[in-house]
Swiss-Prot record:
UniProt record, GO biological process: DNA-templated DNA replication
Organism: Staphylococcus aureus
SUPFAM superfamilies: PsbU/PolX domain-like, Ribonuclease H-like
Biological classification of the source: Bacteria, Bacillati, Bacillota, Bacilli, Bacillales
Enzyme class, spelled out: transferase
Superkingdom, taxonomy of origin: Bacteria
Places the protein is found: Cytoplasm
Official protein name in the record: DNA polymerase III PolC-type
Length: 1435
């Protein structure tokens, strides 16, 4: 009996034959058994061809121990002949091997947490410190090596190394191995053995009844529930309840499942875990759980050694119904002020969440009013339609006056002759209506000198706040004996006379003076005024700041004690004296000339913005709002979008204007002006907003409002202003998030913005309030008035608003006169050129079928636009590669939009136009047809056709909007973009806008930063919840890399969307759509004019070689050979360390090269297959790869591209409509319906094909794959036949990171470097991997007999590699750390004369010393001295 037979007998005896891999069962050997009768031990020596999966290893050990347990203690010693992937298996076996040591259970648990690194025969275990290293090394090194060797590992030694940076993320790769498999594998393997012995089928296979509600274990008593925040240590039995915010269900190799749920009760969050139990339907209960459901759970709280946090190992879990927040009011309110995630870094939920909640509460309508933008409108419309609620569209904008005066109450006074009173007030607060002057100081200036001073305190008869004392350094004691303000102001008025007032931020100071004068019966001041703050902003535009401190430094004026009136006044006076001289130089000589001569078009930048609410009343109002938004973002953007009052007045039709929040003009007026002025301002508005007192608490805390009583008085004045002006007063919530517990996310986002003024204060509770909550907030107004402003007025205002639709419901394409006729004529003209005047019927049928759909649905203009763009590029000498499915259209081929011919494979005679088509599916690509001559005239036949159905492009009915994506050369792309302006006009084309939101990784940083700043510790689950709360909020805007939106000539952009600059960059060359382009994708034409390296590389190859790329044969045998072997390059696999010759060929990265090695393609159609397989999801791995490995089918017959499905099924006999449905279902990852499966089986489609379809999640279009391969084959042609042209082009166009020191070495040295980097590949960073890619190409080039020279100061170009003999000379840009501008500068400096020394090089080209040292090491500076020697001729 052979040793292999012995192993099979053993496997049969311990009953695991059917559990082992076939290769192991057939090739395993039982080499000997060592028996010790004395010790009752048997040691089995077993040789295996490969490692057992860890779970199968434990199964084997359990089975053999159980079989012989009554005879002896059994151990096994394995030898593995093929140790491939030893490092992978070492990680999985790590826990088992640790268990074989004599360490304590606690220490074993600690050791299992450690990171493992396998390098050759050395195993490295990363530990936290030297104490651990010494302990583990002494305690288990020898026994751990022995345990690994017994498992078959070829290990020489184990090293325990310290790793100070051993953070949680470095352990992520061990989670599956340690936490889920290693911890459970022994138990799972035992259970598997028991199942096998019992020979019971899984009950879940026989009963698949769906579970509606999760209920596992015993009912949980509600009185045992405790808050999650109270769980701070391990406990035996705990019950909690919470809402699920994350759920992960994993299948283990044993077939069992583990569910990991993250729940929160909003006091804290916790991870809950549970394994499926034997013979239970737990899996179905797990599947019934989902995010948003509430559960009650009970179990053991323990420290999870992997995540280093407390988790609950559940014994019981049940889904519960949790009472949700209700709006119990009989009559509901309408919210008119609400911020979504589109309020940049401020609002939290998307509009859909608000709309759903409002609908659930029974609100009749809801508004959206994001800060400065309307980007939530498309989603708002969809959500309102879904939930049956009226959507009110609006925005909270920034209103500014068109010009902010510098001088008030102009006087006919010559500035140099005038007398000025420069004054300053210190007050108890900022409101001239509710606060008091405590100090009034002034200096009188004439002829450029201070001629008098005035300084008085006044008694406010109230204690000063600590804030005011700290700010002004005035104390209560200093004011006790001060005169009354009436006396001070009377004296001051007399002292001023008719002088011109001057103050820094004069509106503030004059507000207190005028209020005081009026209370004394004097009426407001009639003196002229000059505001030095606005004056500085106008005449010192180069300054970024204009505060008194800053200006004092700039003007050289001493400011000794800022915020004391007399010192501020004197400093302002001296600054003003110098400003008068500046005005004189600008031609401003009279007080009444200041505003006129110093005004400019940028005056809006100086104005202080006030918040304003704009509500769309009708469709005209929507368009006007779009115009306002656009102007604010494009024309009037200064730090923030601004709306000049004149702009609002121009486009006010169809809009309702509201007063907004405490930052609004009217609220400020109540604080600063008397009631008559307030009522005058109120008349400008259509409705007045008042918001809950809770939202204004911060104003009281910051002493901007004295107290609650004062706040209530402000409300009364606002209501009175509304009553007087005859406009409604409504209560609005200024909501920024849904529920109270969501507020933490807003705090985190605001805290992440150091310059945000909201950081200076405590954020109020800004949740979406119910009607009951709002009524309660305004109870102090009385029940009737509260109901009026909260319910009655909001509903009446909503009733005044018409139904508005912000998004069009159909496609509006541009018009091009004669497009239908031109596309038809062009298609047939080119078809006749190729196929002859007497067109084959298959050509006619395909053209007519396509043209009927294209012209009938108005798509001809889209084709014509694409044709013009491609033709322009071709005329300018740049090829264009098509993307997507456009190659499915024969009309696109005949109009030269794409080079891919979708007809079935066929021959065409270039002379007599004879053609022969292959319609039976026997040929994958026309390029694969054998060479053939024409039987009629003897000319070599052209081979064409990729067999791609048109239905894939425009849908089965031909009415799907065509999506024509084109790959232009990256360097030509801007020209193509600008050509659209020539075609349609500058005001008709815009870049497709995008919205960038906070990503999970970024949100994690925000959360950690916030918690650290606040000194708060939260467990991981709660951090995860907070991260989810911050994720998805708008952070910025951008633009699609190639998308151009085209507006038809009979409409304008505001019919579809506002416009803006990407990321508000006012220097951008293009404006973008304000809406994310996906929102209007079906309404306007989007051209995908993308940039790509391949066309650029083709252009360079053409320039170098003079070869027209279109003439390159696609079926060149030597070219095709490199996809399976490097022989045609004249190198061996060993020399270039690769089994193919595809280094640098498009779409041949490491993964795809492995696919090439596995499949060894020999035809164009097989390369198309590989392109499709490599771009799909679950198309290759675990699918086609296994089918090829097991021999079920070959590369040509697996499903590689989506179109293959339709073609294959039609050839199998299915109706085209059903074949199309199946293709669409599979490509979208939806699998197959029962009807589809039944139809496929009726037509004898094999089971493997059905199974393959069911696995696919996404699959690539064949036309796209064919276009990629066509470009790749052309580039490969140059690689094979014109190597130096290829390498020069590759390094110039595609490579970015170079190691020139290595590249100039001999081929053996380069190969050794590449080999070394391969051995360290898993540890390489991205930059090193990019360098490796370049060195792989260089190694190949060197072994083909070519070499790289060092940089040459005389010959190197700035950016391009140049050819010299059998060598390449690299450009300056290839030097690490040397940028584009410096590369240009070196060449420019060289043109002016040779470099005399390294010092000269540094001086002329601006090179850093490190760059010079690098060039020196490279050998690029031979005989160049450090410094130039002065000769007599230089004198």
């Amino acid at each position: 009996m052979t040793e292999q037979q012995k192993f099979k007998v053993l496997a049969d005896q311990i009953k695991i034959s059917n559990q082992l891999d076939a290769e192991i069962l057939n090739s395993g050997e039982l080499t000997r058994i060592d028996v010790s009768n004395k010790n009752r031990t048997w040691e089995f020596h077993i040789t295996l061809p490969q490692f057992l999966a860890h779970e199968d290893y434990l199964l084997f050990i359990n089975a053999i121990e159980q079989e012989f347990k009554d005879i002896a203690n059994v151990t096994c010693r394995f030898t593995v002949t093929n140790g491939t992937n030893q490092d992978e298996h070492a990680i999985k076996y790590f826990g088992h091997c640790i268990d074989q040591t004599a360490l304590s259970p606690k220490v074993k648990g600690q050791l299992k947490q450690k990171k493992l690194i396998m390098s050759g025969k050395v195993l490295k275990v990363m530990v936290s410190n030297d104490i651990e290293r010494n302990h583990f090394d002494k305690a288990c090194n020898g026994s751990l090596i022995k345990a690994f060797r017994n498992c078959g590992f070829d290990i020489d030694k184990i090293i325990f190394e310290t790793n100070d940076n051993d953070q949680e993320q470095n352990l992520a790769s061990l989670e599956a191995h340690i936490q889920e498999e290693d911890e459970q594998s022994a138990r799972l393997a035992t259970e598997k053995l028991e199942k096998m012995k019992a020979e019971k089928a899984k009950q879940q296979d026989n009963k698949q009844s769906a579970v509606d509600k999760c209920q596992i274990g015993k009912p949980i008593q509600i009185e045992n529930i405790k808050p999650i925040e109270s769980i701070i240590e391990e406990e035996f039995k705990v019950a909690i309840e919470g809402v699920i915010f994350d759920i992960n269900l994993k299948e283990l190799k044993s077939g069992r499942h583990i569910v990991e749920i993250k729940v929160t009760d909003y006091t804290d969050s916790l991870v809950l875990k549970m394994f499926t139990r034997k013979n239970k339907d737990d899996l179905e209960h797990f599947k019934a759980l989902s995010v948003g459901k509430w559960v009650r759970a009970q179990g053991r709280i323990e420290e999870d050694t992997f995540i280093r946090d407390l988790v609950m190992m559940m014994s019981d879990i049940e889904e519960i119904k949790k009472a949700t927040k209700k709006d119990k009011a009989e009559e509901k309110r309408v919210e008119f002020h609400l911020h979504t995630a589109m309020s940049q870094m401020d609002g939290i939920p998307n509009i859909g969440a608000y709309v759903k909640q409002a609908a659930d509460w029974g609100h009749p309508a809801i508004a959206v009013t994001d800060h400065n933008v309307v980007q939530a409108f498309p989603d708002a419309h969809a959500a309102a339609e879904k939930h049956g609620i009226k959507m009110i569209y609006g925005m909270e904008g920034m209103l500014v006056d068109d010009g902010v005066p510098i001088a008030y109450k102009p006087q006919d006074v010559v500035l140099k002759d005038a007398t000025y009173v420069v004054f300053d007030v210190e007050t108890t607060g900022l409101s001239n209506q509710y606060d008091k002057i405590i100090e009034l100081a002034a200096v009188k200036v004439h002829n450029g000198e201070i001629i008098d001073k005035f300084e008085r305190f006044s008694n406010p008869h109230e204690r000063l706040s600590e804030t005011i004392i700290n700010l002004t350094h005035i104390t209560d004691d200093m004011l006790v004996d001060a005169p009354e303000i009436e006396e001070v102001l009377t004296e001051f008025k007399e002292w001023v006379g008719d002088a011109i007032f001057v103050a820094h931020n004069a509106s503030f100071d004059m507000g207190f003076i005028d209020t005081g004068y009026e209370r004394l019966g004097f009426g407001p001041s009639t003196n002229g005024v000059i505001d030095t703050l606005e004056l500085s902003r106008t005449i010192n535009t180069e300054y970024g700041k204009h505060g008194l401190n800053f200006l004092a430094k700039k003007y050289g004026v001493e400011l000794t004690q800022h915020h004391r009136a007399i010192y501020d006044t004197e400093a302002t006076a001296y600054i003003f004296i110098k400003m008068v001289q500046q005005m004189k130089e600008l031609g401003v000589l009279n007080h009444n000339e200041i505003n006129k001569k110093l005004s400019n078009e940028d005056a809006y930048k100086r104005a202080r913005p006030s918040h304003v609410t704009l509500i769309v009343q009708n469709q005209q109002g929507l368009k006007n709002l779009f115009k306002i938004v656009s102007a604010s973002l494009v024309k009037y953007f200064y730090r923030t979008p601004r709306i000049p009052r004149s702009l609002l007045d121009e486009y006010r039709e169809g809009l309702l204007v509201g007063t907004a929040c405490d930052e609004g003009e009217l609220f400020t007026a109540v604080m600063q002006k008397d009631q008559s002025q307030v009522e005058k301002i109120a008349k400008y508005y259509d409705f007045i907003e008042i918001q809950p007192p809770a939202l204004y608490q911060d104003l009281i805390d910051r002493e901007l409002i004295r107290d609650t009583e004062t706040l209530h008085e402000i409300y009364q004045r606002l209501i009175h202003a509304g009553d007087t002006a005859g406009i409604p007063v409504i209560a609005t919530g200024n909501a920024h998030y849904l529920f109270e517990h969501d507020g933490i996310a807003r705090k985190i986002l605001i805290a992440s913005q150091p310059g945000n003024p909201l950081n200076r204060s405590t954020l109020p509770e800004a949740h979406f309030r119910t009607t009951d909550e709002m009524l309660n907030e305004f109870h102090f107004l009385g029940e009737e008035k509260a109901h009026e402003i909260v319910v009655k007025n909001t509903n009446e205002l909503a009733d005044r608003i018409e139904r508005v639709v912000p998004i069009k419901d159909e496609l509006y394409t541009p018009r091009m006169e004669g497009a239908n006729e031109e596309i038809r004529e062009l298609s047939y003209a080119n078809a006749r050129k190729l196929y002859g005047e007497d067109l084959p019927q298959i050509v006619i049928d395909r053209l007519e079928k396509e043209l009927k759909s294209i012209i009938g649905n108005g798509f001809a203009v889209i084709y014509l636009i694409s044709q013009r763009l491609v033709k322009k590029s071709l005329d300018d000498g740049y090829l264009v590669g098509s993307r997507g499915s456009v190659g499915s259209s024969f009309v696109a081929t005949m109009t030269e939009i794409t080079e891919v011919n979708p007809l079935p494979p066929h021959y065409i005679c270039p002379n007599c136009k004879t053609s022969e088509f292959f319609n039976d599916g026997s040929v994958g690509s026309g390029f694969d047809l054998p060479d053939k001559t024409c039987e009629t005239c003897g000319a070599p036949l052209i081979k064409e056709g990729q067999d791609i159905p048109f239905e894939k492009f425009l849908g089965f009915k031909g009415d799907k909007v065509p999506d024509i994506d084109l790959n232009f050369s990256g360097e030509y792309q801007p020209n193509a973009h600008n050509y659209t302006k020539v075609l349609f006009g500058e005001d008709k084309v815009f870049r497709a806008g995008t919205i960038g939101t906070v990503a999970e990784k970024t949100a994690f940083g925000y959360v950690k930063g916030y918690l650290n700043d606040q000194g708060i510790h939260k467990r991981g689950a709660e951090i995860d919840r907070l991260v989810k709360g911050c994720t998805g909020v708008k952070a910025t805007t951008g633009q699609h890399p190639g998308g151009i939106i085209v507006v038809p000539d009979y409409m304008d952009i505001y019919d579809f969307t506002p416009i803006q600059y990407p990321a508000d960059d006012q220097n951008s060359a293009w404006m973008t759509t304000h809406f994310d382009f996906h929102s209007i994708h079906d309404n306007v034409l989007k051209l995908d004019i993308l940039g790509h390296d391949d066309p650029t590389m083709i252009r360079m190859l053409q320039d170098l070689s003079g070869i027209d790329p279109k003439t390159i044969p696609v079926d060149d045998k030597e070219v095709m050979q490199i996809f399976s072997t490097p022989e045609s390059l004249g190198v061996t696999e060993d020399e270039i360390l690769c089994k193919t010759g595809t280094f640098g060929v498009p779409n041949s990265d490491r993964i795809r090269r492995q696919m090439l090695e596995d499949t060894k393609p020999t035809t164009f159609s097989e390369l198309v297959q590989i392109s499709g397989l490599s771009h799909g999801t679950d198309v290759w791995l675990g699918n086609a790869q296994e089918l090829i490995k097991t021999g079920i089918c070959d590369l040509s017959s697996v499903i590689g591209c989506r179109d293959d499905i339709m073609v294959y099924l039609m050839y199998a006999g299915l109706e085209p409509s059903m074949a199309f449905k199946i293709m669409e279902s599979v490509r979208k990852g939806k699998g197959l319906t029962e009807e589809m499966i039944e139809t496929m089986k009726e037509n004898e489609v094999p089971d493997w094909y059905l199974d393959s379809c069911l696995k696919i999640k996404y699959i690539f279009p064949k036309a796209h794959a064919a276009a990629y391969v066509l470009m790749a084959v052309r580039i490969a042609y140059f690689k094979v036949h014109h190597p130096l042209y290829y390498y020069a082009s590759y390094f110039t166009i595609r490579a970015s990171d170079f190691d020139l020191i290595t590249m100039i070495k001999d081929k053996t040295s380069i190969r050794n470097t590449v080999k070394d980097m391969y051995s360290r590949y898993m540890d390489l960073g991205k930059k090193e991997k990019d360098v490796l890619t370049v060195l792989e190409i260089m190694n190949e080039m060197a072994h083909r007999g070519y070499r790289m020279q060092p940089i040459s100061l005389e010959k190197s170009q700035a950016f391009e590699f140049i050819i010299e003999g059998d060598t390449l000379i690299p450009p300056f840009i290839s030097v690490p750390g040397l940028g584009e501008n410096v590369a240009k500068r070196i060449v420019e400096a060289r043109d002016d004369g040779p470099f005399l020394s390294k010092e000269d090089l540094n001086k002329k080209a601006g090179l850093y010393q490190k760059i010079i040292e690098y060039l020196d090491e490279l050998g690029s500076l031979p005989n160049l001295p450090d410094k130039a020697q002065l000769s007599i001729f230089d004198m």
